[in-house]
Amino acid sequence: MNSGDIMKLNIKKILTIGKREVLSNIKRKQFLIATIIGPLIIIALAIIGSFMMFDIKEIKVGYVDEFGLGIPNKVVENNFGKNTTIYFIKYENIEKGKEDVLNKSIDALIVIPKDYLDSGKIILYSTTKSPNPIITDTLNKFLLKKLLKGKVDNKTYNRVINPMNLEIYSVSKKGFEKETFLSQLLPIGFVFLLYMAISSLSGIIVSSIIEEKQNRIMELLLCYSSAENLMFGKILGISAVGLLQIGIWVLFALPIIITYAVKVSLYLAIFALIYFVLGYLFYSSLLCGLSSLFSHPKDASQLISPIIIIQIIPIMFMNTIMVNPNHYMAKILSYVPFTAPYAVVLRASVTQLPLIEIVLSTAIMIVSIVISFILSIKLFKIGVLLYEENLTLKRVIKIIFKK
């Protein structure tokens, strides 16, 4: 962007275009579905699934005890606050037990072989590939109790069942901070939130720009303002829509954070906010420029989809990054603008990053955003009035380097 381009920027017009973009996009059905209805459906399905999983009043389990453990007639298990009764039905014949599993007379059949003590082998027959965990957990506890009976006291038995109550503390120059399971999930949540936000952003940008090109609204807007003002206004408006969408998603998650008193590190929160904004600006400017070249969503998806797919790379290496934040792959991803917003936040969630790495990564992101804006303005000025069919990557590259 040269000084001439900067002089063409009109804040009032940018804000007017941005406002129009916000109002037109929040009225779209896609926005309502993706922002409110989608999360509500996911939450509803999760609640229904949990209710169905944990609201099991009784389970019938057949067994053939060749070893002679002496299995009780029934066991009552506390299943997330609700009691589930497991009835054990003795079988003398394995084939009869299998038959009853098939006709759903019993939920599962357990066979304890004669050589159980030597092999530790237990055979379970079920109509499902993944048997109910209540059955396997109950059986595991029962076997431990039988094997340890008369050999250890109750205190030792309870410790064998639950060998440790692990507390994790992160160590830094500021001192010690206790970590919880949910606080460890927050950076993972951030990664998926950013991925969803940028994926949603691409859909909003593509549909908005292409729709305006098809309806020739873009030409009317260019009569009102320059291409630079129009692009900045669109980025501002679409970014505002995206942030509104994220704000609504965060509101859905807020009850969980408050209920479980999840501690959010200020250090991590600042990192997440900075890199979220940097990532959002980088992708929004790039997508805006590229989308303007196309007249049909199908054509646009061929070029834009690979850019969105690149984001999956840090998700693929998420475990490596969090287990070993100083791994060379984690560092490389921290310096690539497409992946840095993900990699840096994941690394910062498990370790204190050196200042030089933070400065270098942030500088690369800022420079990349500036380059992205310069490139996108060039594409936008040409693309908004371009109505070519089946635009190829080769043609796009020619447009980029055309003087």
UniProtKB/Swiss-Prot annotation:
Protein topology in the membrane: Multi-pass membrane protein
Annotated localization: Cell membrane
Keyword tags: Cell membrane, Membrane, Transmembrane, Transmembrane helix
UniProt entry tagged with the keyword Kinase: no
Regions that span the bilayer: 31-51, 186-206, 238-258, 268-288, 303-323, 355-375
Main location: membrane
An annotated Gene Ontology molecular function: ABC-type transporter activity
Single GO cellular component term: plasma membrane
Family to which this protein belongs: To B.subtilis YhaP.
Name the record gives this protein: Uncharacterized protein MJ1024
